[in-house]
């Protein structure tokens, strides 16, 4: 397969279906997006590295200045980035920088918890570039968690979320490391995006009650992530219990219980899984 140098990776826009989860999980994910995440910062840094739009393509000074102002806000308040990004898109609707602007807006709306606008920004990002693994991997994870099961056209939206994940997994191995990029950081970034894709697939499998498949996907998610998501450990433990892998469930719940807003719930579930391991026939 021919390696690709991804300049403006993109995503496939769509929605997903959330399985019935406890309030604790939704509280946990909202806690994670309430402040800027490592993924969010990485996306802004990627945008900064792509400031050069290529030889022979002219940009006026006002446009370039507005884009630089957006990138300068990359480590600050996401609400500020949103204002700068929306202003840029309104003022320069045909800008060559728009793929990056909509990528920044997608991640910024994610950390602000604005699901609808996150989807809208992502839709525009994919229209401008179909291989944006930054945005695609983010939505592959977020969509199945953030859209309720009562959403209209739920089955279709679930399929779309699944497509994001598979496309991410397909593209990332073909990416060529930029010449000045650190090898370890490049691998870390790729693995973190793959982890998001596998997390999304695991959640989708949970919704379909395919618990063995969910175990496979969620195990990959926690193994690939540089900082595994406690929600993935929670879901993995739940899939383990459903498949009668009680000892594995104990291990997953104990990882989930190490920290975060799900800690108390995971401790209780770990104790329950221990009881199941002693009293039931497991695998």
Predicted regions and their residues:
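N-terminal leader/linker segments that initiate helical-solenoid repeat arrays
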Residues: 25-100, 283
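Structural register within alpha-helical repeat arrays
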Residues: 68-69, 105, 139, 194, ...
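Terminal, low-structured helical/coil segments at or just beyond the last alpha-helical repeat
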Residues: 178-180, 191-207, 242-283
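Residue-level recognition of tetratricopeptide repeat
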Residues: 107, 141, 145-148, 203, ...
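Short solvent-exposed coil/turn linkers within tandem alpha-helical repeat scaffolds
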Residues: 91-98, 128-133, 173-184, 188-192, ...
